[in-house]
């Protein structure tokens, strides 16, 4: 029986080719060297600015506050009381303006919103001042369509 043509010769040849390729790449690496010279960035500033890195948003397992806080400045806390002195009555009659003693931390927008909510009138403008006794006084000017005297009667201090 004649010997069959060997198919094992081809893998040896291909493995020899891969070995030659490996040897050539190794030669290239040896010629090039492992520690190649890299181009460095020239620093022109003496201060080192830390680079901005990725900051992921927090994903808490549970909320740290069990109950949300009640609103700290509601309409009833904003307006402490109406002012009904003689000069306040003159402002009501002449300038269509209501006077209130308000919370010291309330701002003009909060005062206007509180007047709108409690007395159903839209104020034209709000002026404030801090009195010498440390309380805040608000002058709430009403629109010409609304009479301040009627609102004062509705509040109940006339």
UniProtKB/Swiss-Prot annotation:
GO biological process: translation
Domain of life: Eukaryota
GO molecular function, one term: rRNA binding
InterPro entries according to UniProt: Nucleotide-bd_a/b_plait_sf, Ribosomal_uL23-like, Ribosomal_uL23/eL15/eS24_sf, Ribosomal_uL23_CS, Ribosomal_uL23_N
Biased composition (Low complexity): 12-23
Sorted UniProt keywords: Ribonucleoprotein, Ribosomal protein, RNA-binding, rRNA-binding
One Pfam family hit: Ribosomal_L23eN
Keyword RNA-binding: yes
GO CC term, one of those recorded: ribosome
Annotated segments matching region Disordered: 1-43
Its job: This protein binds to a specific region on the 26S rRNA.
Family: Belongs to the universal ribosomal protein uL23 family.
Protein name: Large ribosomal subunit protein uL23
Organism name: Puccinia graminis
